[in-house]
Amino acid sequence: MTQRLKDKLAVITGGANGIGRAIAERFAVEGADIAIADLVPAPEAEAAIRNLGRRVLTVKCDVSQPGDVEAFGKQVISTFGRCDILVNNAGIYPLIPFDELTFEQWKKTFEINVDSGFLMAKAFVPGMKRNGWGRIINLTSTTYWLKIEAYTHYISTKAANIGFTRALASDLGKDGITVNAIAPSLVRTATTEASALSAMFDVLPNMLQAIPRLQVPLDLTGAAAFLASDDASFITGQTLAVDGGMVRH
């Protein structure tokens, strides 16, 4: 495999498990060192990245809290000296019918799914600007284009992710920084397996996808590595649907 990210430093939120961990390990294979921000420990991700010969930092961090993100940013810079790639992957996705949705639940979903990306960008974009190079990848969702019930709060955050991607790309293009988003389908992870979403595992791929199998985190890693590399240096402001052909636009 190529080393397109040789000696880059990638920050990944929610990198302890699932999609974030898969992207972290792929970036390490591509030659990057990794900094993970997550609320839970990441011993398996750490071990895998170290076994690939790369440096890794994992920090307990509530990515929705400005103080936590500021402290995390300082620790990353003191450890590695810079951040080249930022992957805003952390998110929550509880199914809640609109009639039952409280304002507190709405706010929490936005804080974790949207505010975190803003806070992380504020922490690391200044350094990217100084270096004249940077990559920001935001994880969104194909649910933005679909009819999905009990997801008003979540889909609203995913629309915000796409808008943030497009707008921030306009601000940062002159600084050598690209900003793109990846929109997966329903992905099998330990978290989704333990949630109400698991009821759709056997239904959704056959009903809506051209490739009729359930998506796994590994399916997203190639797209992420591409967007993080110089191969995608003239691509910005885009949302790439990596979803087995569910959405076509």
Swiss-Prot record:
Protein name per UniProt: (S)-1-Phenylethanol dehydrogenase
SUPFAM superfamilies recorded: NAD(P)-binding Rossmann-fold domains (SSF51735)
Binding-site residues, substrate: S141
Active site per UniProt: Y154 (proton acceptor)
Cysteines paired by S-S bonds: none
GO molecular function: 1-phenylethanol dehydrogenase activity; nucleotide binding; oxidoreductase activity, acting on the CH-OH group of donors, NAD or NADP as acceptor
Quaternary structure note: Homotetramer.
A UniProt-annotated Pfam family: adh_short_C2
Organism this protein belongs to: Aromatoleum aromaticum (strain DSM 19018 / LMG 30748 / EbN1) (Azoarcus sp. (strain EbN1))
UniProt similarity note: Belongs to the short-chain dehydrogenases/reductases (SDR) family.
Lineage start: Bacteria, Pseudomonadati, Pseudomonadota, Betaproteobacteria, Rhodocyclales
